Regions:
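Short, structured surface segments that line ligand/substrate-binding pockets
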Residues: 50-53, 59
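Extended polybasic, low-complexity segments that bind anionic RNA or targeting/receptor surfaces
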Residues: 1-50, 97-213
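Glycine/serine-rich anion-binding loops at beta->alpha junctions
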Residues: 58-95
């Protein structure tokens, strides 16, 4: 399928337009499907959910059920079989019991990629995707980025970068409600969690190239 293109404005750190970047309709202009987006989010949550503990009782561990000695006459304490909790390798008394086993949902790569496209398209519809020019990164400070967020009326933002820029990341990490991730880590859950998605010039190009393969 041939891709048509739409344009998204590229902004300087002062919030002013510095040009336009063409992005593929096949990624940023789909009609968002909530069912696909939810499927991918559920998969992400299942991958990162905490695995609860499960211990075996004396009835579940492997071992002989034969009584280890006579009940009386040995001079020692009375014991049952080797699966009792007092023996090494025996069952655990009153241990944690998870309700069912933790299972990670399976989702093929094609559906995960499609979910990413639909999540990005939903942000475009809400006018919540911004592209930040790479040219200003060498000298900008934390206050410059805070002002930029105010100009685009953003209360929280996901910054997706390509080339790791030490100045950029050091200044962004001090700002509340901002998360930065490398382009390769772009995911549906974070896109939906934050109000705005900020790409750098290079990161949106690289993401587009990857998703169109």
């Amino acid at each position: 399928r041939r891709s048509n293109y739409m344009k998204i404005k590229e902004l300087g750190i002062d919030g002013k337009d510095v040009g336009n970047i063409e992005v593929s309709d096949n990624i940023f202009s789909l009609k968002p499907r909530k069912d696909i987006i939810k499927m991918v989010v559920d998969w992400q949550i299942s991958r990162h959910s905490k695995k609860t503990g499960y211990t075996k009782t004396r009835g579940e561990v492997a071992g002989s059920r034969k009584k280890i000695g006579p009940q009386k006459g040995s001079g020692g304490a009375r014991h049952g079989n080797i699966t009792a909790p007092i023996f090494v390798g025996g069952g655990i008394a009153h241990g944690p019991k998870a309700k069912g086993k933790h299972r990670v949902k399976r989702l093929n790569k094609k559906v995960r990629k499609l979910g990413l496209k639909h999540a990005l398209s939903s942000k475009v519809l809400d006018n919540k995707i911004n592209i930040l020019s790479d040219k200003d990164f060498k000298n900008f400070k934390t206050k410059d980025f805070s002002k930029f967020l105010s100009k685009i009326n953003s209360k929280s933002a996901l910054l997706i970068y390509d080339n790791e820029n030490e100045v950029l990341l050091n200044n962004v990490k001090n700002i509340k409600n901002i998360k930065n991730i490398p382009e390769i880590g772009t995911n549906v859950y974070d896109i939906l969690k934050y109000q705005n998605v900020l790409f750098t010039h290079s990161s949106i190009k690289k993401l587009q190239e990857r998703l169109l393969k």
